[in-house]
Amino acid sequence: MGKDRQPRGQQRQGDAAGPDDPGPKKGAGTREQRGEEEAQTCCGCRFPLLLALLQLALGVAVTVVGFLMASVSSSLLVRATPYWAGIIVCVVAYLGLFMLCVSYQVDERTCIQFSMKLLYFVLSALGLVVCVLAVAFAAHHYSLLTHLTCENAPDSCQCKLPSSEPLSRTFVYRDVTDCTSITGTFQVFLLVQMVLNLVCGLVCLVACFVMWKHRYQVFYVGVRMCPLSASEGQQQKV
């Protein structure tokens, strides 16, 4: 009796204004969007972008070491100096940087985005195969050098397999003044190439997995099932 009562009109206006107030809903939506954007980034960068940067750094390193190996002797084969593997990985990295920095979206909305993601996936797979080949060639050449006996010759280095080998051959490395550049420096370059190409192949494999996961493993089953469960609950109540 002693309490003041508001008129019924004011109470109805207050009740009607509550559900229509867009303030808290907008704030919650922006917070959810910010959370999703932060989940897709790592230190301010998207996770696939970090993979592309690693591809670029490793590709440049493989290319530089490959050209240094080619400068040791002019008679080295192309497969023995895998600068070509680094060039291919650099091309893949440039495409990935362009795609991830300009217009990257998890769900493809245009044919250009789908084509770029597919091309990046295919080139990353190609980079993986090329890196594996480079590792195989470097390992074969390294194991061969461990069995060779090298001797200095005029403007060259002649290396021979032991006479006990059934296929005894003589390998001539031209434009070499000292055989230590073959048995020492060149062997170190081969080891470095094996490590770099192995790591580069793993990065290309992870890039392929990330592209495949974003394409085929992005499901929104919970968002779709919640309205269905809510509607079923309403039907049961009725």
Curated annotation (Swiss-Prot):
Q: Which residues cross the membrane?
A: 49-69, 82-102, 118-138, 189-209
Organism domain of life: Eukaryota
Q: Does the keyword Transmembrane helix apply?
A: yes
Q: Where is this region: Disordered?
A: 1-33
One GO CC term of this entry? postsynaptic membrane
Q: Which residues lie on this side of the membrane: Extracellular?
A: 1-48, 139-188
Subcellular localization(s) per the UniProt record:
Cell membrane; Cell membrane, Sarcolemma; Postsynaptic cell membrane
Q: Which UniProt keywords apply?
A: Cell membrane, Membrane, Postsynaptic cell membrane, Synapse, Transmembrane, Transmembrane helix
Whether Hydrolase counts among this entry's keywords is no
Ranges of Low complexity composition bias in the record: 8-20
Record InterPro entries: CD20-like, Sarcospan
Q: Name one Pfam family in it.
A: CD20
Q: How does it sit in the membrane?
A: Multi-pass membrane protein
Ranges per topology, Cytoplasmic: 70-81, 103-117, 210-238
Role played:
Component of the dystrophin-glycoprotein complex (DGC), a complex that spans the muscle plasma membrane and forms a link between the F-actin cytoskeleton and the extracellular matrix. Preferentially associates with the sarcoglycan subcomplex of the DGC.
By what name is this protein known? Sarcospan
Q: What is the organism of origin for this protein?
A: Oryctolagus cuniculus
